[in-house]
Amino acid sequence: MFLLLPFFLYSFLFDEIKGGNILYKICRFWGDAFFFATGISHRNIYEEEHDRSKQYIFVSNHISYLDIPMMMKAIRGQHVRILGKSEMTRVPIFGSIYKKGAVLVDRENAGKRLQSIKNLIYFLNKKISVFICPEGTFNMTNQPLKNFYDGAFKIAIQTQTPIKPILFLDTYDRLNYRSIFSLN
């Protein structure tokens, strides 16, 4: 990841749209390199036709540390922004990169949560898809899904943007919050 730092910094030369799009291309390269280096194979299977010329609200559960690189593999050929928790910006170096590429949400502040929704709508209006984990956090329960927050669904109704559910098969078995990395 640190080898990509100069490329991440390059994205800071541009505005939030172009710079963010560059950042996601770099992250996709990182995802490809990660999967190659670990020997994990990946395949996208669509239940219905996927039109890359349209923007979507992608929704997925978040149950594994492998979910983010998997997202980078799953969403190809279109621009996307992920809704992410603002606390991640406190991580040195990574936090600045994260802030450039994510729509941040402060889950403890209702006003800032509302601003996050407005920011997601802004990107949808710019023809950029958004990725939301409607559980609102990393799922550290024994249940496959936690209760969903309704923000993704309200945004879909308000903007008439289709929701595209994504399922990452076996990521929990490979890199969940309780286990050591396993390639079984």
Summary of predicted features, one role per range:
Residues 62-64, 135-138:
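Short glycine-rich anion-binding loops that position phosphate/pyrophosphate groups of nucleotides
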Residues 102-124:
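A membrane-cytosol interface segment of integral membrane proteins
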Residues 29, 66, 115, 147-151:
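Short, conserved clusters of charged catalytic residues that mark active-site
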Residues 37-45, 113-114, 171-174:
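Short gly/ser/thr-rich secondary-structure transition/capping motifs
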Residues 8-15, 20-25, 29, 36-38, ...:
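Catalytic core of membrane glycerolipid acyltransferases/transacylases, capturing the structured
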Residues 47-52, 181-183:
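A short beta-turn/loop motif at secondary-structure boundaries
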Residues 93-96, 125-131, 140-184:
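A cross-family acyltransferase "interaction/gating" segment
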